């Protein structure tokens, strides 16, 4: 049976190390690849953030990149409440993330723009520093 293709995920909020939903506490365990960066806008939604890619107010958003299994990807989809259609709070995207100067194709959970229309951007690219600062 062929091996499943390698998957990576970029986590920028509560799934980061030390966060409320720390990915390292999930099973099957992910493999840490390194710190990553992407341009976008972070929004403080309550006890968690939402990231919109690009935009006029984009900053460098930092996060962690992990190699994950298909089983863990399904668990993450549940945590992020991914549902078919336009009503999902997050959309799962595949994007290029800069990891130590090299591009890595990663899954990223991007906030549905409907959920941030009336929100102000954080103006900061590191949720952990913002949240614990």
Q: Where are the regions a protein language model picked out?
A:
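Glycine-aromatic micro-motifs
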Residues: 1-133
């Amino acid at each position: 049976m062929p091996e499943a293709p390698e998957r990576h995920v970029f986590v920028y909020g509560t799934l980061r190390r030390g966060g409320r939903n720390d990915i390292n506490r999930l099973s099957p365990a992910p493999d840490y690849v390194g710190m990553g960066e992407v341009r976008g806008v972070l929004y403080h939604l309550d006890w968690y953030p939402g990231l919109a890619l690009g935009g006029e107010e984009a900053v460098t958003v930092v996060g962690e990149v992990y190699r994950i299994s298909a089983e863990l990807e399904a668990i993450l989809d549940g945590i992020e409440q991914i549902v078919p259609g336009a009503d999902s709070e997050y959309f799962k995207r595949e994007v290029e993330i800069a990891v130590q100067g090299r591009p890595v194709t990663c899954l990223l959970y991007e906030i549905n723009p409907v959920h941030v229309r009336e929100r102000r951007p954080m103006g900061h690219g590191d949720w952990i520093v913002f949240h614990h600062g």
